[in-house]
Amino acid sequence: MNKANPKNTPSVVPKKVFIKTYGCQMNVYDSQRMTDSLSSKGYVATQTPNDADLILLNTCHIREKAAEKLYSDLGRLRVMRQARTLDKPLMIGVTGCVAQAEGNEILRRAPMVDLVIGPQMYHRLPDLLEQTKQGKKIVETDYPVEDKFAHLPPHNKRAVRKRGVSAFLTVQEGCDKFCTFCVVPYTRGAEISRSVEQITEEARQLIEAGVKEITLLGQNVNGWHGQIANGKTWRLGDLLYHLAKLDGLKRLRYTTSHPRDMDDSLIAAHRDLDILMPYLHLPVQSGSDRILKAMNRQHKSIHYLHLIEKIRTARPDIAFSGDFIVGFPGETDEDFEETVKLIKQVQYSSAYSFKYSPRPGTVGATMKNHVDEAVKDARLQHLQVLLLEQQNAFLRSKIGQTTDVLIEKVGRHSGQMVGRSPWLLPVVVDTEASTGTVMSIHIKNAGSNSFVGEIANV
């Protein structure tokens, strides 16, 4: 009996997927999970679109002209697709929040797109791709009955290791706050919280793959809640205490928070858990109570400042970042000065600031009394100068201090590594230490958005 010669067996060439990710950390997580899902169909990730058999654009709808940016990118992909030969066809898909908002309009304006799926549907991606192979165009933007997270495969350990020692983990999705400037409730849907069991299992998978730092994600992450076996309801603070006990995990973070859901148990976690990093992104958007009301933020500036004080009392070394919108409809010079006043009171380590732009479908888009663009520009410049001054002051304040740094990747130069400080900023240090190591580092200097350090003498 002749045995088959494995050398004569033709090898199966894996299909390649390229995912371009726009926007927030949750989109990064979603792209990673889509890659994991597609691995069951023989796809491997590629960093080069020209090599790809499948290109997915995982879109964000938060900023102005998000849809036009998508159509511009699709125009370039159309040219790429036309240049392909018959033996190297290219499939194109649009996912994420612009897909949710635009739906069939994407196929109308870009007929070469094969599938359009919203952020709640990507667990069905492998099956939907099979349908496109039969020439069917797919648009799936409904909210499914099933729990998408329950239908995702386990993390691919090899892929996790390649991504590094820090990882995102979505625990909450959607938003019920309906801020008048924001599209998230319309593109991500109502707030849902994943179960403690699901979150714990996924965290364990990440840790087993070598992850040392996990950032919990949610559009309103501190709105997370879940029931445990005895029927008791947990909030995010309880979840953090629970995850802090997992063997092998060295650091925890979470983002993005709403001031309304920043409760005492969560503040206590900042006080009690060394594993919870002293950094908090807590957007406020405006310092004017009148504008906060128009934005439907459901709190006043004094409430926000009181929270900042309570959190700093619990964790004195904490650094705050925030979000600010200038030029919201009806914003006066006095309103803007209230924002400047709040920023000076808080003293941020970093912050994001933007000009208001109306998002289709939001209440803000129907408001009158819009602020002149030149006024918006001037206010934004004023704000960014102030915020940059605060960022530089924060960076300088850490020079001479010694802090723990998580080594994440190889640096640009030989013998150099880059790590992550407790305040999220990168630290460059000369060391041969392995990734995943937490080292005591003396901060020698600071750049515009990073530190330079050396191994501390212990």
Curated annotation (Swiss-Prot):
EC number per UniProt: 2.8.4.3
GO cellular component term of the entry, any: cytosol
**Keyword check for Iron:** yes
Print the keywords alphabetically: 4Fe-4S, Cytoplasm, Iron, Iron-sulfur, Metal-binding, S-adenosyl-L-methionine, Transferase, tRNA processing
Signal sequence: where?
Answer: none
List the catalysed reactions.
Answer: N(6)-dimethylallyladenosine(37) in tRNA + (sulfur carrier)-SH + AH2 + 2 S-adenosyl-L-methionine = 2-methylsulfanyl-N(6)-dimethylallyladenosine(37) in tRNA + (sulfur carrier)-H + 5'-deoxyadenosine + L-methionine + A + S-adenosyl-L-homocysteine + 2 H(+)
Q: Does the keyword Transmembrane apply?
A: no
Q: Where is this chain's protein located in or outside the cell?
A: Cytoplasm
Which intervals hold domain TRAM? 396-457
Q: Name one GO molecular function term.
A: metal ion binding
Record-annotated MTTase N-terminal domain positions: 15-134
User: Which top-rank group of organisms is this from?
Assistant: Bacteria
PROSITE patterns assigned:
MTTASE_N (PS51449), MTTASE_RADICAL (PS01278), RADICAL_SAM (PS51918), TRAM (PS50926)
What does the record say about how the cofactor binds? Binds 2 [4Fe-4S] clusters. One cluster is coordinated with 3 cysteines and an exchangeable S-adenosyl-L-methionine.
Which positions in this protein are listed as binding [4Fe-4S] cluster 2? C175, C179, C182
The prosthetic group or cofactor this protein requires is: [4Fe-4S] cluster
Q: Which InterPro entries match?
A: Elp3/MiaA/NifB-like_rSAM, Methylthiotransferase, Methylthiotransferase_CS, Methylthiotransferase_N, Methylthiotransferase_N_sf, MiaB_methiolase, rSAM, rSAM_horseshoe
Q: Which Pfam families match?
A: Radical_SAM, UPF0004
Q: Which residues bind [4Fe-4S] cluster 1?
A: C24, C60, C97
User: Which parts pass through the membrane?
Assistant: none
> How does it associate, per the subunit comment?
Monomer.
- What family name appears in the similarity comment? Belongs to the methylthiotransferase family. MiaB subfamily.
Q: Which HAMAP family match?
A: tRNA_metthiotr_MiaB
**Can you name this protein?**
tRNA-2-methylthio-N(6)-dimethylallyladenosine synthase
